[in-house]
Amino acid sequence: MNFYMKYLLSTALIALLLVSCHKEQNAFEQSPSERMKQQRTALQNELTEAPYGWKVLYFPRTDSLLFATPTKAEKRSDSRYVEKLLNQGFGGFYFLMTFHKDNTVSIQADTYSQTIQTAKTSEYNLSQEAQLQLSFTTYNYVHQLVNNRFRAAADWLYVGKDTLQNIVFKTASYADPAREYIVFEKLKTSEDKQQFLQKAYNNRLFFEQMQNPQIVIKRGSKIYYQSDVYLKGNSFGLNTPFLEGFVANRYYVFEYRTNPQEDPSTGRYRSQFIGSGYVGTEKGLTFRAGLRYSHSLIFYDFVRQGNRFVAEHRDSKGIATGYIAEIFDN
């Protein structure tokens, strides 16, 4: 390499370093308050520049450990079992939210037909101290969950984005993971906006109106778990408040008798349980913290196929493992 070429190369490298240092210097020249203001403005722009609004999935109070060991059989007559069922976990809710630049938000909810059709307009605020926070400052459908049952919150802390570029929030209620779930997904078409909440409601209602919902977990022809107890019947001593809790709390438990020869009328047989909170989606059902067969085999999202809900298990890399879970009315 001759002297002239070396000179040009050195000059280019020096210029590149100077530009890089200048950019870095500009970043550090911003004060913390300026950076926070920039982040707040960016989030507000993103929320308000979604012409069709946002699908918001909110599980305010999940419990990943309530039925976390289904392969461990429990006595149905055990007081701990009864306490777990009567104090079962809680499911989620689906909202349609449309944010406006005047700090108002229109919200529809999946609770009833009326809440799907009737939007409530309330005020919201984006503030930032230690963390960027979205607060619903006047009453809307979210506040209906701020009670002793669901223990929801109307102040949501911005976490960031997931791998699908959905916006993720949390609340200050829990430090532990898997205790709540708040995800915003941008709606892409006016048709989605008009239909997704009604479809989600219909799928949830279809599941809740099943007379004898059961689940089977299988891989090929091999069955790993198949529930077989008729929980909605009266022959096993389940009282009305317990059954009402399934729907009111949006939580369901599937039960499998480990010894079919035991008399079910005694209530003293041993069973294995799988349970989780749920919500209807436009495609089917979503369970959080998931229907768990083992620590690595957990089913979350079920697609409605005719009269069944089917979930295909995938590993941490998104590769199908061959395990399938199906919920059906037996």
Residue map of PLM features:
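C-terminal motif of bacterial Sec signal peptides marking the signal peptidase cleavage site
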Residues: L17-S20
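Short linear motifs in intrinsically disordered
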Residues: L43-E46, L96-T98, W156-G160, L297-V303
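A structural detector for beta-sheet-dominated domains
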Residues: L57-F59, T98-H100, Q108-D110, S127, ...
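Long, acidic/polar, low-complexity amphipathic helices and coiled-coil-like
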Residues: N103-G233
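Preference for solvent-exposed, low-hydrophobicity sequence contexts
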Residues: L187-N330
